[in-house]
């Protein structure tokens, strides 16, 4: 475990991806350094999010940022993160301090979202603590697709993420 990572205050700089047709909202914790570098959600080359979600939806893997946005909207998937800002060391979710939540009503007041999913335990925990009291909507916790979560096989990820299909 790398303990040398310095904690820094990070703010979220991606707009939420959604439109009038979005049916589910998929929430991460916060963009990782790699995602901030690539300028889009789940941007680490070894993050399995885009692969598993496109496989579950029966579509080819979207490559560019524009492809990913179109893919999400076409499949009625809204994408955002639980946090607007926090102190974090690198991409280590367990190091998060002083979290500032995003206002989920930005999406929920405009769109009829049927289910909210968290892409990882920490995102679910932060949502339950900081967002659920305001939204009144439970979150369904999915396993993290981050490269740090290599204990879980692709088959297990696929099975877990298949749950989203019930709502699309």
Please report, for each region that a protein language model flagged, where it lies by residue.
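Alpha-helix N-cap/helix-start and coil->helix boundary motif
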Residues: 47, 123-124
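C-terminal capping/extension of enzyme domains
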Residues: 2-23, 45, 92-105, 128-168
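Internal catalytic-core helix/loop-beta-alpha segment
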Residues: 74-123
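Short, hydrophobic/glycine-enriched beta-strand segments
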Residues: 23-29
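Short, glycine/serine-rich, charged loops/turns that create anion-binding
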Residues: 31-34, 84, 123, 146
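Short, surface-exposed acidic-centric catalytic microdomains
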Residues: 34-95
């Amino acid at each position: 475990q790398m303990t040398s990572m310095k904690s820094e205050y990070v703010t979220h700089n991606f707009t939420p991806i959604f439109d009038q047709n979005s049916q589910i909202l998929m929430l991460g914790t916060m963009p990782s350094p790699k995602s901030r570098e690539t300028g889009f959600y789940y941007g680490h080359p070894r993050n399995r999010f885009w692969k598993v979600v496109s496989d579950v939806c029966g579509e080819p893997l979207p490559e560019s940022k524009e492809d990913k946005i179109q893919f999400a909207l076409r499949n009625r998937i809204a994408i955002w993160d639980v946090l607007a800002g926090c102190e974090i060391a690198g991409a280590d979710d367990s190091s998060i301090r002083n979290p500032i939540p995003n206002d989920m009503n930005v999406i929920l007041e405009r769109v009829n979202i049927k289910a909210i999913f968290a892409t990882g335990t920490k995102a679910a925990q932060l949502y339950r603590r900081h967002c659920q009291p305001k939204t009144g909507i439970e979150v369904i916790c999915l396993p993290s697709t981050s490269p740090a979560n290599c204990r879980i096989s692709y088959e297990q990820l696929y099975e877990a993420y298949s749950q989203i299909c019930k709502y699309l």
